[in-house]
Structure formats: C-alpha cells, structure tokens
Amino acid sequence: MANEMEFEKPILELKSKIADLKEYNETSDVDLTNEIEKLEKRLAKLEASVYSNMTAWDKFQVARHPERPTTLDYISLLFEDFMELHGDRAFGDDAAIVGGVATFNGIPVTVIGHQRGKDTKDNLHRNFGMPHPEGFRKALRLMKQADKFGRPIICFIDTKGAYPGRAAEERGQSEAIARNLYEMSDMKVPIISIVIGEGGSGGALALGVGNQIFMLENAVFSVISPEGAAAILWKDAGQAKKAAESMRITADDLFELGITDGIIPEVKGGAHRDLTAQAAEINKTITKSLHALMAFSEEQLMNQRYEKFKKIGVYEIL
C-alpha cells in the first residue's frame, strides 16, 4: 500500500488478510464469520500495541507522511470567514507560508502557518514548506497587524526548516528569522503555536514564540533533522534512526523538558487517518488556551511569554 510506513507492515498484512477473507466469505458457501471476528480482535490488539509503542523514528516518519494534514486543511475546518493575505510589502509573496484573518468560534483571530504541497507541482510552488525571508516577513506583517487590532495569533508549524538557498541568504534569511523572534516576544496579544508535523530548526522558531506551544502527538521538533545530525555525528546519514532516538525530538520529550505546554492526541495511526477527528482535537486545545490567555492583560501576556522562554534551557549540575 502506498505511503505506508515500515512499522505498520504487520498491521497492513493482517488487514489485507481480513479483507481477502471477507471477500471470499461473500462469494463462497463457506461461513468464515468466526475466523474473521477472531482476526479483527487480533488486529485491534496489534494496533493498540504498535501505536502505543512507537519509537522516535516511527513518529518522525508519521510527522513526514505525504498525506499528513497541512495548515490549510486545518484552517478549512477550524476557522470561519478565512481571508488569506499575501506578500511582505517588500519583495514578494512566499507560498511556503500562508496566513490571514478569520474567526474562531466567533473570536476574530489571525492565523498563520507553514504550508507544504500536496503533490509534486504543489510542493514546487510551496517550496516543500521551506520559507524564504519574504515568507517570514509576511508572517511578521500579519502578526503586527494582529497586534495593532488586538487579534489573538494562532500559528501552525510544519516545516523541515528555513530554505537554505543562496537567494534566501542574500535576502537576509537569518535576519528575517531573528526579527520574528524579537518582535513576537513583545506582542501584546495572545500567541498560540501548534506543531502539526515537523518543527525544523529556525524555520519553526520563527512562528514559535508563543505564550503556549502545543504539539500533535506524533509531531517532532528539533534543531536539525535526524539525517542531518547523523551526517554530522557519524558521517553517515544512514544512521538517522539512531540519531532520532538520541535527539529527544518527540512531543513527549519536549513536554518533559518544559519546552511545550501540552500534547494534542492524534487519531489512531496518525492525523492523516481522520482529518475531521484530528481537527476536533485541535479545536479543544485552541478553545481552552484562548479562554485562558484572553483573561490576561497586555502586560501579563508579555511577561508570561518572557518568563516561559527564559526558563528554557535552564539546568543544574547534580
């Protein structure tokens, strides 16, 4: 089956066997109902075992799944009256980042996120979700607009990282990212950031200075990809699985380290299995977070955000 992952093979093989038996059961005189029921019970146990014992590498594969829902997928289900806004008012429009104004349960908000493509043509248009400087500057323009008009900001993070090409560097890639971090830290409105897939390095951080940060259960957040880390540490990108297990990139890891504020449960097998159900889980988290943050004053929001990031990376020697 296309786009299925290595760790799911036992599940897929059993599902295929059940499907074959059901088809045979409908066309033959032999009653295989009992056998099918036994296999379905076995399948339920197998799925529970596999999906509750996923490794960091397994989750990394799910986070990169080609059919994983994107920012625009979630926007269509979570927000009303979304109006996309374009351009950074300096160089151009970057399709790797989408954003605009909308309402969330009647509350005017600004929503921004990385956008990967759905197929080869779309990925080329979206630059595989890797923003150029104009993408980050577009995001900042929308954030400043939200700050001016008192609209909460909701960011969806899903990128391998900022685009590392020559043109991007010439247009000030590092400055654009740094400027977002600087400006976001001083915004007077609630900022909620949600890692929905892959949170890669500075490209993710540029939308990640939130009052609260959440991750989907199978999302990852890291300074470098496992392949990149393996190439640096062991001179062998083939050691990516080993690197993933060492890097602490999963939602559980980031929550334990105090970097994120919560984990959003995923539907069994990953968000791509049921977009509507997954959007409903995200809706619950945004609703609860907005309710809490909108009770804060402007000064409290800025202080809370400052204190949150001030604590990250603090350690003590035992």
From Swiss-Prot:
Where does this protein chiefly localize? cytoplasm
Which PROSITE patterns would you find in this protein's record? COA_CT_CTER (PS50989)
Q: Per the UniProt record, which EC number(s) apply here?
A: 2.1.3.15
Q: GO biological process: any one?
A: malonyl-CoA biosynthetic process
What family classification does the UniProt entry report for this protein?
Answer: Belongs to the AccA family.
Q: What class of enzyme is it?
A: transferase
- Record's subunit section: Acetyl-CoA carboxylase is a heterohexamer composed of biotin carboxyl carrier protein (AccB), biotin carboxylase (AccC) and two subunits each of ACCase subunit alpha (AccA) and ACCase subunit beta (AccD).
Q: Which SUPFAM superfamilies match?
A: ClpP/crotonase (SSF52096)
Recorded hits in InterPro entries, A to Z, give:
Acetyl_CoA_COase_a_su, ClpP/crotonase-like_dom_sf, COA_CT_C
Species of provenance: Listeria welshimeri serovar 6b (strain ATCC 35897 / DSM 20650 / CCUG 15529 / CIP 8149 / NCTC 11857 / SLCC 5334 / V8)
Show the GO cellular component annotation of the record: acetyl-CoA carboxylase complex
Q: Which domain of life is it from?
A: Bacteria
From the UniProt record, list the reaction(s) this protein catalyses: N(6)-carboxybiotinyl-L-lysyl-[protein] + acetyl-CoA = N(6)-biotinyl-L-lysyl-[protein] + malonyl-CoA
What pathway is this protein said to act in by its record?
Lipid metabolism; malonyl-CoA biosynthesis; malonyl-CoA from acetyl-CoA: step 1/1
Keywords, ordered alphabetically: ATP-binding, Cytoplasm, Fatty acid biosynthesis, Fatty acid metabolism, Lipid biosynthesis, Lipid metabolism, Nucleotide-binding, Transferase
Q: Where in the cell is it found?
A: Cytoplasm
GO MF terms held by the record = acetyl-CoA carboxylase activity; ATP binding; carboxyl- or carbamoyltransferase activity
Q: Where is the CoA carboxyltransferase C-terminal domain?
A: 38-292
Its annotated function is as follows: Component of the acetyl coenzyme A carboxylase (ACC) complex. First, biotin carboxylase catalyzes the carboxylation of biotin on its carrier protein (BCCP) and then the CO(2) group is transferred by the carboxyltransferase to acetyl-CoA to form malonyl-CoA.
Q: What is this protein called?
A: Acetyl-coenzyme A carboxylase carboxyl transferase subunit alpha
